[in-house]
Amino acid sequence: MTYSGPAIDTHHHIWLRKDVGWLADPPVPRMFGDYFGIRRDYPVEEFIQDVKPQGVTKSVHVTAMWGPGKALEETRWLQSVADKNGFPHGIVSNVDLADPGVEAALKAMRQAAAEGVH
């Protein structure tokens, strides 16, 4: 029997290419190979359209690594997207746990609705 109930996508990304340095900058070799096909905007509306047929009703966005010093900005943007569109339901952001300002960074992320960090 095949499962046909609701599903949660526990790791996805959305972005505007202009905000993500490694997508907007000239391509360089990456450990994950050729990424030409994703060097474009992937807005939440398209994500929702892509996952609805699979029964996805909730999702968790994992950082798209906007670049140094931009993690809080990314998290705040994602929360504004969620407030407007209902997706994503959780946000996993990026914080350097070795940074001397880690406590302040974690507090700021929590206020911006981050559910976790990596």
Where are these regions (language model features)?
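An N-terminally biased module of ancient metal coordination in phosphate/nucleic-acid-related enzymes
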Residues: M1-Q79
